[in-house]
């Protein structure tokens, strides 16, 4: 007798990335339907102490996976306290109320912690796991217990 119940195999196959060595990596994250590429140029300034290490332009795609697994991470992390798939910066189309009580659609950045072992911090505060947390210009992100700080800015803020 045939079994037409969902097996989950198709969903697992769409979340799997094949590596060059023949192994595969199961992604912890799927983009939501409201995912959009940003209309303004967002940047992440990476600092260790007072020294700027690099500048990352993060407006070319709608989501950036952050983690230690270099085969899937868009923004690789080196620190051992960071998870292989630690967090995602996701741009989402959301409704925002204007000063007249109406609403308009805007694209905003959010961060979501992918149930990492040592957490994600925004402006020194730990954020909840598996939930979108809205980011604003000048927010400071930290991953795990790493000392590196990632400062988020966009073209209208310098």
What are these regions (language model features)?
Residues 1-80, 93-99, 154-158:
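Intrinsically disordered, low-complexity acidic Ser/Thr-rich regulatory segments
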Residues 142-143, 148-154:
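Eukaryotic regulatory low-complexity N-terminal regions enriched in Ser/Thr, Pro, acidic
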């Amino acid at each position: 007798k045939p079994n037409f119940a969902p097996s989950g195999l198709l969903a697992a196959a769409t979340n799997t990335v094949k590596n060059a060595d023949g192994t595969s990596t199961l992604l912890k994250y799927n983009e939501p339907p409201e995912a959009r590429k940003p209309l303004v140029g967002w940047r992440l300034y990476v600092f260790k102490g007072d020294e700027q290490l690099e500048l990352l332009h993060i407006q070319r795609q709608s989501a950036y996976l952050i983690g230690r697994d270099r085969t899937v991470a868009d923004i690789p992390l080196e620190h051992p306290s960071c998870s292989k798939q630690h967090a995602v910066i996701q741009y989402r189309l959301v409704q925002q109320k204007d000063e007249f009580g109406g609403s308009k659609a805007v694209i905003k950045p959010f961060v979501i912690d992918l149930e990492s072992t040592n957490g994600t911090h925004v402006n020194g505060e730990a954020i909840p796991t598996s939930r979108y947390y809205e980011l604003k210009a000048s927010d400071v992100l930290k991953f795990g217990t790493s000392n590196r700080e990632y400062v988020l800015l966009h073209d209208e803020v310098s």
